[in-house]
From Swiss-Prot:
Pfam families hit by this protein: 2OG-FeII_Oxy_3, PKHD_C
Species this chain originates from: Rhodopseudomonas palustris (strain BisA53)
EC number per UniProt: 1.14.11.-
Protein name (record): PKHD-type hydroxylase RPE_4577
Cofactor: Fe(2+); L-ascorbate
Binding site residues for 2-oxoglutarate: R171
Key words of the record: Dioxygenase, Iron, Metal-binding, Oxidoreductase, Vitamin C
Family matches, as InterPro entries: Oxoglu/Fe-dep_dioxygenase_dom, PKHD_C, PKHD_hydroxylase, Pro_4_hyd_alph, Pro_4_hyd_alph_FE2OG_OXY
Binding note for cofactor: Binds 1 Fe(2+) ion per subunit.
Gene Ontology molecular function terms on file: 2-oxoglutarate-dependent dioxygenase activity; iron ion binding; L-ascorbic acid binding
Enzyme class label: oxidoreductase
Domain of life, per lineage: Bacteria
GO BP: any one term: DNA damage response
Amino acid sequence: MLVHIPEVLSRDQVRHCRELMARADWVDGRITAGHQSAQVKRNLQLPEGTPEARELSELVHGALSRHPLFMSAALPKTIFPPLFNRYDADGEMNFGSHVDNAIRTVPGTGVRVRTDVSSTLFLSDPDEYDGGELVVEDTYGSHAAKLPAGDMVVYPGTSLHHVTKVTRGSRIASFFWTQSLIADVTRRAMMFDLDMSIIRLNADHPDHPSVLSLTGLYHNLLRQWAEV
């Protein structure tokens, strides 16, 4: 299940992020890759723990907690502190097919996060670069995402995915993982579909008695399936 989440960041917030990144020093992105991923990863990354990275991470984390569509799609229990990467054309940068590590440890804390949901928040507009599509594979085929700056795509952490080679410009993004209250991807997708159906029904028929009964069903399923 891929979900496009629009306007996670405003244009002003994106501009602020880009200004911070312009002052920062970038390093080889393989510093956060697992053994398998490091063999196919060619990009740059902001080092964790720098003042710029901390401010950017806090900005993105705050925006996520205020976005109802992300909360519905991911049902977050723990969000790994957002990271930031860049793919440049002059380095022929790309990220070959891989699956994200199942468990991530938050640096300096010992807190472990199960990567149920993967997210990419675009910080470059599509016309700023060629290539650089995020391609996610599932049982229904391949799905490519190349979204406006400030928009985000979320998808199951179990998915095989890759980033195509950037041939012009630079692709800048934030990426992170979420441990969901519901680990099972099928149950999580069902809850998202149910929540969206309730929202649409309430918008069209706010006094319909099914709004209340379906809302009760949603919370009872969450009570049964959630890990807290």
